[in-house]
Amino acid sequence: MAGDVTERVNASINLVRSFLADARGQVPVDCDLLVDAHDAVATFALGGKHLRSMLVHIAAGEVSGDKRYAAEVFGACIDLMHAAFLIHDDVIDSDDFRRGVPTIHSVVRQRTGDYHLGTSVAITAGDLAFNAAYRLLAQAGLPGDLTTEAFRIVTDAADLTITGELLDIAHSVNPAPTPELVGTSNRLKTAVYSFAAPLKLGSLAAGRPISDMDAVAEELGGAYQVADDIAGAIGCYDKTGKVAGGDVKQGRATLMTIRLDYGLESEDLHQVVEDVIAEGQAHLTRARQLIGDLDVPKTTSDGLYGVADRIADMLVDHA
């Protein structure tokens, strides 16, 4: 199944590549900043691990014909949506690096010396990626009812993700958000669009009930966010591709930073990390139980167990 999923993810990537090339060819004027924006969308949508597209294809399973094409379209759509969120998130978080390369706002800022211009181009590039996701889905030629339901899934996910991002911003200015509030923003900004939406889209493509994936997605997403929060607080650049300790330096409220105190001794920090890792492992335990209860093909459940194992490895990296 792993090789088959890789092949299907690559088909989704090729859809994105072709769509973005066509879109760039339709740019009516020659403008360096337009080139910057389109290049940024391509860099983010075509690079990375393509976890979300992979989840679409895992949930769809070994489908063929029209169902396989629908899964390929949905995988491409979610990759473009992910690119949009990443570009905007880097602006919000003032991150100058992503995946080990400069972010779009930092590229433009460094070249022009204009901070605001870099921010403006990045915001516009994120808008381009969002619009590309919706246009690709609308123009894919899928049946109308399938397209309508897919639009509902991705727009509902986008709405909740934006809400979670706004809560995250609020936590940066409001003193001492509770772990419960941070957990809520994490669930909204990560579990919904990174796990629930892809798994629902894959189920939709295969013609299976989409609501069955909600609980699994929440637990996998919770564990994934735990691993990401640990990496953001103590991860090294070589592994994360981002500035080490960025969440601490920027004062972001995460599951790690709300537990940290600058006066911590090394053994205290170790205990904080262990506590947060345990939270992630609890999510994975529940996720595996829920996966076992799903009424899905074995290839789908095996793929989901594989995702849980992958997240577990991310947690072990920090143990």
Regions from the language model: what does each represent?
Residues V29-D30, T43-L51, I123-D127, N131, ...:
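All-alpha helical catalytic cores of prenyl diphosphate-utilizing isoprenoid enzymes
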Residues A2-V5, V9, A71-C77, G126, ...:
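Hydrophobic packing residues in well-ordered alpha-helices of helical domains and bundles
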Residues V272-A319:
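Short hairpin/turn module used for nucleic-acid contact or packing/dimerization
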Residues R99-D127, P175-V192, D238-G280:
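Divalent-cation-assisted or electrostatically stabilized phosphate/pyrophosphate-binding catalytic cores
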Residues M1-A83, I87-R111, Y115, D168-P177, ...:
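Conserved N-terminal diphosphate/IPP-binding helix and adjacent helical/loop segment
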Residues L55, A133, G164, T257, ...:
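Residue-level signal for inorganic ion chemistry
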Residues H57-G61, L86, N131-Q139, L199-L204, ...:
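Short glycine/serine- and small hydrophobic-enriched flexible loop segments
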